[in-house]
Regions:
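FAD-site-proximal beta/loop scaffold in flavoenzymes
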Residues: 161-177, 262-353
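A Rossmann-like FAD-binding core segment of flavoenzymes
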Residues: 76-77, 112-115, 119-132, 200-304, ...
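Rossmann-like dinucleotide-binding cores of NAD(P)H-dependent redox enzymes
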Residues: 92-99, 172-173, 178-182, 188-249, ...
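Core beta-strand elements of the Rossmann-like FAD/NAD(P) dinucleotide-binding domain
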Residues: 7-9, 134-143, 258-267, 307
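Glycine-rich FAD pyrophosphate-binding loop
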Residues: 28-45, 202-213
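N-terminal Rossmann-like dinucleotide/flavin-binding domain of flavoprotein oxidoreductases
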Residues: 2-7, 46-137, 141, 217-244, ...
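Flexible, glycine-rich terminal cap/loop adjacent to redox cofactors
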Residues: 14-40, 52, 56-60, 369-485
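Glycine-rich dinucleotide-binding loop and its adjacent helix/turn
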Residues: 51, 148-203, 236, 284-305
């Protein structure tokens, strides 16, 4: 098909989700002409089928759970959660899957939105097939930034195609509550969606192939969240895999498990990881493998066969940290680096420099909106040991020693861990589990990213009585030796 028109930009961004938006905004701030290509909704997966709608589903569930933990408040709960009300609230936060507001934002920063499927067509060139089947060629003077994100990675099991299981999209946009729901996978999506749908009225069975939940976190995170799920009524099964599945009828699915048993549910959600959305973006035209993750340096410049330093990748697609906030950080730095290079200015790529995604290596924050919540940043104790730090760990049971936590919830159950490099006294990582801890995460992130030492932390006085007083209790545990190496 012939090219209908040609357009020139300084920067072309493939993908107008939050990562692409941040890259575009920084490039525009540097005075560059930016074209953004989007084949679905402007705002991307996070805005419509992941972060935002999932938290809209979870918030009412957690709010009710919090109320039930407080004498005097629990008596006010006389009914069940209104799924209809929850779905209506979610729909408002995803603007009924209408992206006109975010499209207006793109034009508001002075960027140009081109709707359609974009593919690389050699160096610095992107060809977009629009909804009218026209082909528009975009040429980038300085850079192309790939921000196409990721898709669900589904296992190759008998019956998958016929069964049409849920992925994160159906789990976050459904307006019907299945009576019985199986969730396959015990990572972040799995435990959050098990929490949400159990709270909305499903009987949820959570299946984990491994020996526990959230295996990349400190071990106590999965233990406490698993206990919370069981207390909420979820059937949690570990060490079990799905061998095959089949749909009995429009409302029933049978899972064949590797222990020989069968599980019959109304719907099944597979939360079994992510794969890069790079299989159909023309990577082969620039010497890269279609469907691969794009390895980048700390400016988000793609390594490998690409010459002249024009191809960047930010967000899920580079496989550094599959988290929206971290991808936005990468997008900002990529956009700033492109702007500096275009102006002929030197780059500050030293650790923690203006053009270095140093936090990807040392200070990635993540939160799980389960019951109890979990939040972590930096290294786990094992990761710190593997990196050959001289590690010392301090642990506390939050509900035993923090008055603010006791006031927050009767019988508060939670745990916090601080990982310290003994040679420098520097904080390497923090993990917290308990009601309300996600709002404490940024203080931990500042401490880790800022190379704050234990000695200096003593001067950061937490307000009494707040859950933040766990910082003081961690310091006391570290000082008094109620910790371990």
């Amino acid at each position: 098909m012939a090219i209908a028109s040609e357009r020139d930009f300084d920067v072309v961004v493939l993908g107008a989700g939050p990562i692409g938006q941040n890259a575009a905004e920084r490039a525009r701030a540097a005075g560059l002409r930016v074209g953004m290509v989007e084949r679905e909704l402007v705002g991307g997966e996070c805005s419509y089928w992941a972060c935002v709608p999932s938290k809209a589903l979870l918030r009412p569930v957690i709010a009710v759970a919090d109320a039930r933990r407080i004498d005097g408040a629990r008596e006010a709960i006389t009914g069940t959660i209104s799924a209809e009300g929850v779905f209506g609230r979610r729909n408002r936060y995803v603007t009924d899957w209408d992206d006109s507001g975010q499209a207006d934002w793109v034009s508001g920063i002075g960027a140009t939105l081109v709707r359609g499927h974009g593919r690389l067509d050699g160096p610095r060139r992107v060809v977009v097939t629009t909804g009218d089947d026209e082909r528009v060629a975009l040429t980038a003077r300085h850079a192309v930034v790939v921000c196409t994100g990721s898709r669900p990675a589904l296992p190759d099991l008998p019956g998958m195609t016929e069964t049409k299981p849920w992925t994160n999209r159906r789990a976050t946009d459904s307006s019907e509550v299945p009576q019985r729901l199986a969730v396959v996978g015990a990572g972040g999506v799995g435990v959050e969606m098990a929490t949400a749908w159990q709270g909305l009225g499903s009987q949820v069975t959570l299946l984990s192939r491994g020996s526990g939940l959230l295996p990349r976190m400190e071990p106590f995170v999965g233990e406490l969240i698993g206990r919370g799920l069981i207390d909420a009524g979820v059937d949690v099964r570990v060490g079990v895999s799905v061998r095959a599945l089949r749909r009995l009828d429009d409302t029933s699915v049978v899972l064949e498990l590797d222990d020989g048993s069968e599980l019959t549910v109304n719907e099944v959600l597979f939360a079994t990881g992510r794969a890069p959305l790079t299989d159909d973006i023309g990577l082969e035209t620039v010497g890269l493998e279609p469907g691969s993750w794009l390895e980048v340096d700390d400016t988000c410049l793609v390594r490998g066969a690409v010459e002249d330093g024009w191809l960047y990748a930010a967000g899920d697609v580079n496989h550094r940290a599959l988290l929206t906030h971290q991808g936005k950080y990468q997008g900002r730095i990529a956009g700033a680096a492109i702007g500096a290079r275009a102006a002929g200015n030197p780059l500050d790529t030293n650790p923690w420099g203006a053009h270095a995604t140093t936090a990807d290596h040392y200070a990635v924050p993540q939160a799980f909106f389960t019951d109890p919540e979990a939040a972590a940043v930096g290294l786990t104790a094992q990761q710190a040991k593997d990196a050959r730090y001289h590690v010392r760990v301090a642990d506390i049971e939050i509900g035993d020693v923090v008055m603010g936590a006791k006031l927050y919830a009767d019988g508060y159950t939670g745990r916090a861990r601080m990982v310290v490099d003994q040679e420098s006294g520097r904080l390497l990582g923090v993990t917290m589990v308990g009601p309300g801890v996600t709002e404490l995460l940024h203080s931990a992130t500042i401490a880790v990213a800022g190379h704050v030492t234990v000695d200096r932390l003593w001067h950061a006085v937490p307000c009494f009585p707040t859950i933040s007083e766990l910082w003081l209790r961690l310091l006391e545990a570290y000082r008094d030796g109620s910790d371990h190496n």
